[in-house]
Amino acid sequence: MLELTMATVSAEDAGATAGMLMADAPSDPGTVLRVGRDRAVCRLASPDDWLFVSRVHLEFLCGPDGSWQVTWLRGSHAEPPSEVLLTLAGLPMAQPLPYGGTARLAPGGSGELVIQDRTAPRSVNVGFYHEVHAA
């Protein structure tokens, strides 16, 4: 099972956790969880007026072996108005996830993706935990 938590943070409410959203999905091949502004297709949706977040920004996909990966989907802009940083538990520093890039999530692993606005002190913070059950 993949568990996601999402919080939106701006300069006015930095450090606040009010409004945290959660979603989870079983680790079945082909299962998808999306993060973005489009509430029709995204399980976790950011504010509609936060245009630095694409309609569908991040896609978590479960592969045939039950492992998960996350992709920063390319949007309508050649250069995105945001950046995405990936932090994995046990590693000291966040790494940039390239625009259109994919990262594999370790089974049983956890971490955080931060969608950072390049023009204002706002971010969407998405925590993840891949729960693995023994067979």
Residue ranges: model-predicted function:
Residues 1-50, 61, 65, 96-134:
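Intrinsically disordered, low-complexity acidic Ser/Thr-rich regulatory segments
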Residues 35, 57-61, 66-86:
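Short hydrophobic/aromatic patches on the structural cores and recognition surfaces of FHA
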Residues 43-46, 72-75, 79, 91-93:
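Functionally constrained cores in energy, signaling, and assembly domains
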Residues 82-95, 116:
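Short strand-turn-strand beta-turns centered on an Asx-Gly dipeptide
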Residues 52-55:
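Short coil-to-beta strand junction motifs in C2/discoidin
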